[in-house]
Design a protein with these regions (language model features):
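Loop-centered beta-sheet repeat module
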Residues: 91-143
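Structural motif
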Residues: 42-45, 81-88, 131-136, 203-209, ...
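Repeated scaffold domains used in trafficking and secretory/extracellular systems
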Residues: 22-26, 61-69, 107-116, 182-187, ...
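Blade-loop segments of beta-propeller domains
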Residues: 1-32
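Short beta-strand elements that form the blades of beta-propeller/WD-repeat-like
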Residues: 29-38, 71-79, 85, 116-135, ...
Length: 293
C-alpha cells in the first residue's frame, strides 16, 4: 500500500518453483524492487512492482531477517545456524560475517523478533531480544558496537549464561523470570532527537524513550492516545510499531479494536469519518506519526 492507503500490489507467488516462495520470513523494498526472504527454502527472491520475478539468490543457511539495502549492501540474520549471526551481502555476493555465535547458547537463545534491523539514512542498526548491545553499519561497512543499554543495574549478568546449562528456550525463560532482570531490545528506532526501543522487566513489556537533547530517558508501560481517541490508554504489550527510514513510525490498529474503542471514546477529527465507517473485518488502520522535535 502507498502511504495514502492506495493498493500498490498484491503479490502471490507461494510454491516451490524457482521464482516462488514457501513463506515470507521477511522482506525489504529497495526502490522498484521487492526482495522476499524465504527461510525454509534458503533463498531470497527479487520481484518488480508488477510481481515479475527478477532474480533468485540462494543461501547456505537459514536466515530469519533481512536488512534494508544501503550502497548495494545488506545483512542477513541467521540466529545460531552458522558460526556467525550476521552475513553481509555486497553486490549479491557473500562478503563477510559478523558476531560470532556462542555455541553454549545455541540450544536456547534462538528467539524470533518482529524486527532485527532499522535504517536511518545510510546507517543500518542491528539488535536482538537477548542482547544489551546495538550494532551499527554505515554505508554498508562493518557492523560494529554502537550503544550499550544500561537497565540501571538490572541487566542480565554474564554469569547467568555460563553458570547453568539450559535445556531449551522455556527452561531459560523460566529461570530468567524468577529474577528481576530487564532484557531485550525490540523495535529500536533513532532520529536526531530521540531513541526509542521496547524491553521486558518482570514479565511486562516496557517502552523507553531517550531524549538526546535533554540527556534524559523515560520508561513507561502504557501509552495515552491523544490523536485518535482522547483518553484511551493502550498497554505497551498491544503497541506494535514499525519504523520507516525517514523517521516516521507506523502503528497498525486492528479494525475490531477500533470498533470497540469508538463505543467508549469519541473519535477525534479529522479521523472520525474513517473510524466511524470501519467494520470489524476490515484491514488494520495504519497510524503514521513523527516525533515532536
Amino acid at each position: 500500500f502507498s502511504e495514502e492507503g492506495e493498493l500498490a500490489l498484491c503479490l502471490e507467488k507461494r510454491g516451490e518453483a524457482p521464482d516462488e516462495y514457501s513463506g515470507i520470513s521477511d522482506f525489504v523494498i529497495d526502490g522498484e524492487n521487492i526482495i522476499i526472504l524465504d527461510r525454509n527454502q534458503q533463498k531470497t527472491i527479487t520481484y518488480d512492482h508488477s510481481g515479475n520475478s527478477i532474480s533468485t539468490f540462494h543461501l547456505k543457511y537459514y536466515a530469519q531477517a533481512i536488512s534494508p539495502i544501503v550502497n548495494n549492501t545488506f545483512f542477513l540474520y541467521n540466529g545460531f545456524d552458522t558460526s556467525h549471526k550476521l552475513h553481509r551481502i555486497k553486490n549479491w555476493k557473500e562478503d563477510s560475517a559478523f558476531l560470532e555465535v556462542d555455541k553454549n547458547q545455541t540450544g536456547y537463545l534462538f528467539i524470533f523478533a518482529h524486527h532485527n534491523f532499522y535504517q536511518d539514512h545510510d546507517s543500518i542498526y542491528f539488535f536482538q531480544p537477548i542482547n544489551d548491545t546495538i550494532y551499527k553499519s554505515v554505508e554498508g561497512g562493518n557492523m560494529n558496537p554502537f550503544l550499550h543499554i544500561d537497565f540501571k543495574g538490572k541487566n542480565i549478568p554474564t554469569s547467568f549464561f555460563s553458570d547453568k546449562k539450559y535445556e531449551n528456550v522455556k527452561d531459560f525463560f523460566d529461570n530468567l523470570n524468577k529474577r528481576s532482570y530487564a532484557y531485550g531490545i525490540y523495535s529500536f528506532i533513532r532520529d536526531k532527537r530521540f531513541t526509542m526501543f521496547g524491553s521486558f522487566y518482570q514479565k511486562n513489556k516496557k517502552l523507553t524513550l531517550f531524549d538526546h537533547k535533554n540527556k534524559s530517558s523515560n520508561t513507561f508501560g502504557t501509552i495515552k492516545d491523544d490523536v485518535y481517541f482522547k483518553g484511551l490508554t493502550i498497554p505497551i504489550s498491544q503497541f506494535i510499531y514499525h519504523a520507516n527510514k525517514d523517521g516516521s513510525i507506523v502503528v497498525p490498529l486492528e479494525a475490531y479494536s477500533v470498533v470497540e474503542w469508538r463505543n467508549t471514546y469519541t473519535p477525534s477529527e479529522p479521523f472520525g469519518s474513517i473510524i466511524n465507517t470501519t467494520k470489524e473485518d476490515d484491514n488494520p488502520l495504519l497510524l503514521i506519526f513523527d516525533f515532536k522535535q
